[in-house]
From Swiss-Prot:
Glycans are attached at residues 66, 127, 361, 397, 454, 495. It comes from Bos taurus (Bovine). The gene is KLKB1. InterPro entries: Apple, Pan_app, Peptidase_S1_PA, Peptidase_S1_PA_chymotrypsin, Peptidase_S1A, Trypsin_dom, TRYPSIN_HIS, TRYPSIN_SER. Disulfide bonds join 21-104, 47-77, 51-57, 111-194, 137-166, 141-147, 201-284, 227-256, 231-237, 294-377, 320-349, 324-330, 420-436, 518-585, 549-564, 575-603. The active site is at 435 (charge relay system), 484 (charge relay system), 579 (charge relay system). This is Plasma kallikrein. Residues 21-104, 111-194, 201-284, 294-377 form the Apple domain. It catalyses: Cleaves selectively Arg-|-Xaa and Lys-|-Xaa bonds, including Lys-|-Arg and Arg-|-Ser bonds in (human) kininogen to release bradykinin. Its EC number is 3.4.21.34. CDD domains: APPLE_Factor_XI_like, Tryp_SPc. Forms a heterodimer with SERPINA5. The zymogen is activated by factor XIIa, which cleaves the molecule into a light chain, which contains the active site, and a heavy chain, which associates with HMW kininogen. These chains are linked by one or more disulfide bonds.
Amino acid sequence: MIALRQAAYFICLFATVSCGCLTQLYHNIFFRGGDVSAMYTPDAQYCQLMCTFHPRCLLFSFLPENSTSDADKRFGCFLKDSVTGTLPRVSRTGAISGHSLKRCGHQISACHRSIYKGIDMRGVNFNASKVRSAKECQERCTNNIHCQFFTYATKTFFSAEYRNTCLLKRSPQGTPTRIKVLSDVESGFSLKACGNSKIGCRVDIFQHSAFSDVDVAGIIAPDAFVCRTICTYHPSCLFFTFYTNAWKTDSQRNVCFLKTSQSGSPSSPTPQENAISGYSLLTCKQTLPGTEPCHSKIYPQVAFEGEELHVTFVKGVDGCQETCTKMIRCQFFTYSLFPEDCRGEKCKCSLRLSLDGSPTNITYGTQASSGYSLRLCKRGDSRVCTTKRTRIVGGTNASWGEWPWQVSLQVKQRAQSHLCGGSIIGRQWVLTAAHCFDGLLLSNIWRIYGGILNLSEITTETSFSQIKEIIVHPNYKISEGSHDIALIKLEAPLNFTDLQKAICLPSKDDTKPVYTDCWITGWGFTEEKGKIQNTLQKANIPLISNEECQKSYRDYKITKQMICAGYKEGGKDACKGDSGGPLVCQHEETWHLVGITSWGEGCARREQPGVYTKVAEYVDWILEKTQDSHGQPLRK
C-alpha cells in the first residue's frame, strides 16, 4: 500500500498539472526558471501564500537570509509558472521550494498571523506611535485602513528614541520592499484578512454611481461583484467603480477600476449611467459573498477571451467549469453552443488564462456561456469541507475515504496500541480530547496514523506522524472532565489525499444551525466490556439539548462548553477507545467538527447520552494556539 501511494505521489509531482493538493516544502532545493514575479517575504510560508494568490504561480522558491551572500536576494520569494507543472530542481543550501496551495481547499486563506523577531520589513512608513508590544502594534496596523505590515522596536532597541515605537507601513505590492536583519525589532502583517479588523466594512453597491479618486489598476470583469472580489484581494484597493457593457466609452466597458485615496474613503460619488461602485470587503469580520477569492457564477450568452490553454469537448457548462477547475493553470473558460462546435451531447470547452487572471475581453450576445475556475474556492477540488459523509456501539463498518479527517492516536511503550481518536483540522494540526494525555504527555511515545481504515494494516512500513507539541487546554482538570480538549502540532505537515483531509471547524460567529445529520466514528469498543475494533466504525446519532442531557446526569454539571448526543433508548454511542474522536454534522453541504468524544455513563445505555466537548466554544482558543504555526493559519 505504501509503495503504491509513493508511486502515485511521484507520478503526480513530475507528470501532470492536474493533481490535487501538494503541501510539501523542499529544503535545499531551488526551482530553476519559470519566473513570473519576485518579492521579499519573511519566510517560505508567506512566499507560498503569495504564490497561491498570484494568478499564474504554480511553484515557488524562497531564499532565507542565510542561504545567499547576495544581499539583494536575501528573503527573496520567486514565483514561478510551468506548462508541465514542474521545473528543473537545483541543489542550493538553505533554499526552500514548494507548490501553490490553489488546489488545497480549506487552506486557502490570505490570513497570516505570525510575528517575526529580528527582522525589519521595510516599506513606506506613514505612521509612528508608542505601544507596549508587537501584538499591540499588529492590532494598530489591523485597524488602520492603509496599513499592510509593521515593524515594532522593542524596549531594548539600540536607539532609545525609537524604543517601543510601532511603525505602520505599506507598499504597492502589499509586501516589504526589502527585509533586513535587525536586533530588537519584530515585524508582521495586518490581520484584516483574518477578520480581526474593527474598522468595519460596507457591503453597499451603488448603482449608476462613479467614484473618482486615484486609480491603482484597471481589470476586465463581467460584473460589479467580481470587481468587488478583485478589489478585496488587491493590496492597494479600498473601493472601486465598474463600467458595464452599456458604458458610453468602448475602451472602458467591463473595466473594473480599483481605487484608493489618502483619506481611505472615496470622494462624493458622481451620478453616472451604467457605472456601479462599491468597497473592498477586506475589513469585514464575517465571511460574506465576495470575501472568498473565487467566482462561481456562470455567465450565459457571454464569451471570455484570453490565451488558449486547452480545448476539449464536454457535456454541459458545469462540466466545462469542472474541467477548468481540475486543470490548475486554467483561470476561466468559455463553453460554446454553436452547432459547429458540438459533437452530439458534447460541445466545445475552451480553457483559458491571462497574465492577471481575468479575461482580456468580454463579448456579449453569443451562443456561449463563460465562467471562472473554482481552484481558489475553499470548497474547491480538494473537497475538504464537502466530503460525502462521510467508542462506537451499534455502529457499522466505515468505507475507505469516508471519514478522511479521522486519525488513530497510538502509544508505543512495551507494545504499540490504539488509545484515542482525533480529527485533522489543518495540515499540521490534530484536535482531540485532553484526557487522552492523562499521564502520557511525553510527545515521543505517540504515533499518529491518518488515512487508514483497518488497524491491522498498520505495519512497520506504514507512514505515521510524530508529535511536535501537545497543547492541553489550560482549564482542563482531570477530576472535573470539563474543557476536555487538546491540540496536537505535528512535526511535519500532512500531504492531503482522498484518504487524508481536514474537517472544517464550526464558526463561533454563525447563528446556531440546526444539525440533523450527525455522525460519530472510531475504533473503540462495540460493547462496554469489549475490545478495540479493527475496522473504523460509524454511527448516525441525534443531538439533544443540554437541558435534556442534564436530566440524565444529575450528579454532573453539563456546561455550555459541552454538547450531548444519543438516542433515548440507547443502542448507539461512543465507547472506550473512541475518546478524542469526532462528532461531525452536515450543514448546508459542509461537514463541521461539532464535538469531541469526551465522556458518558457506560456505553449506549438507555437515557445516558454521550457527552462531547463543544468545539464552537473553543474556536478562539484554537485560532490563538495555531496562529504561530508554520502552516497556513486556521480560519473560519
